[in-house]
Amino acid sequence: MQQQLEQFLAYLTVERGLTGNTIAAYRTDLDQFVNFIVERNTGSWSNVSRDDLLAFLLFLKEKRYATSTIARRTAAIKSFFEYLQGQHSITTNPTENLDSPKVDRFLPKAITVAQVDELLELPLTTSGPEGLRDKAMLEVLYATGMRVSELVALDVGDVDLAIHQIRCLGKANKERNLPIVGSASTALEEYLDIARGQISRNGGDPALFLNHRGKRLTRQGFWLILKGYAERLGLSDLTPHTLRHSFATHMLNRGKDLREVQELLGHASISTTQIYTHVSNDRAVKYDQAAQRPTVANAAEVEFSA
C-alpha cells in the first residue's frame, strides 16, 4: 500500500509538476491516512470502503483537528483514489460523493500603506549587512506580491536590475517576470553591491538571500526575521501572507485592474484574485463580461478605482 502512495507522489511531481512544498503536504496528509488504513487490516486499497473513510474523518474530528486540516486531507485522499482508479488499481472509488467539511475562508487583513512604510524602514536600524538584506527582502516581497516560498527560492541569476525585472518560479513551475522598480530596486542593488558578499561564506551558493551561515535563507528563517520587525511595530499578527494580501489590495486601490493583479500574483483563476482582494462578485463578473466582449460600452461599465 505504501508503494502505491510513493508512486502517486512521484506522479504528482513528474506528471503534474507540483512543487516540493505541495508534495510534502500531500505526504503528510496521506501518511496518516495510510497508517490508519493499515491498522484496520484492509489488506489492499481495493478493499477500502466508504465506512473506512468515514471512520478516518471521525478520528480526525475526535482528535480536534481544524476543519481546514480535515478538508485538506479529504481532498488529498480523493486525489489519491482518483489516481488509483485511473491506474486500474481499484474498480470502484469509495470517495465518490464523499463530502468535504465546509471551511470558512479567513483572509489576513491588509495593513495600511503607512504601516508598510514603517515596516520597510525598520531594517535600517539593524546594523551590519543583515539590515540591508532584510530591507531588500521586505521591499521585494511587498513590491512584487510574491509568495514567501518564491522569495526564498530566488537565485542571484533571477535578478536583472538593468531591465528592472525579477524572474519568479511559482506554483506548478509557472514562470513569471515581475517588475522591480523604485525603492525596491534600490534596496536590492545595495544588498547585492554591499551586503551579500559580506554574508556569503564561500561565495558558492546561488541563492539571492542568505542566512548568517552563507546558505539559502529558509521560509522559517524569513518568518522569524519578519516576526521580529512586526513585534516592534505592535503588529504581532503580521505574516508574509499579509504583505502579499496588502500588495494586492493597495494595487487595486491605486487603480490597477483585476487581470493585471491576477498576473502579478500568479493566480490561475481570477476568482482566486477576487477572494484575495475582497473584490465584490459583481465586480469580477463585470470584468469577465468586458473581457469576453471588449466593446467600449462594456469597458466603460467596469470601475476599478477603490
Curated annotation (Swiss-Prot):
The keyword Methyltransferase does not apply. GO terms for biological process: cell division; chromosome segregation; DNA transposition. It is found in: Cytoplasm. Residues 1-85 form the Core-binding (CB) domain. GO terms for cellular component: cytoplasm. Disulfide bonds: none annotated. The keyword Nucleus does not apply. Gene3D superfamilies: 1.10.150.130, Intergrase catalytic core. Keywords: Cell cycle, Cell division, Chromosome partition, Cytoplasm, DNA integration, DNA recombination, DNA-binding. The active site is at R147, K171, H241, R244, H267, Y276 (o-(3'-phospho-dna)-tyrosine intermediate). GO terms for molecular function: DNA binding; tyrosine-based site-specific recombinase activity. Residues 106-289 form the Tyr recombinase domain. Belongs to the 'phage' integrase family. XerC subfamily. NCBIfam families: PRK00283.1, recomb_XerA_Arch. Forms a cyclic heterotetrameric complex composed of two molecules of XerC and two molecules of XerD. Site-specific tyrosine recombinase, which acts by catalyzing the cutting and rejoining of the recombining DNA molecules. The XerC-XerD complex is essential to convert dimers of the bacterial chromosome into monomers to permit their segregation at cell division. It also contributes to the segregational stability of plasmids. This is Tyrosine recombinase XerC. It comes from Herpetosiphon aurantiacus (strain ATCC 23779 / DSM 785 / 114-95).
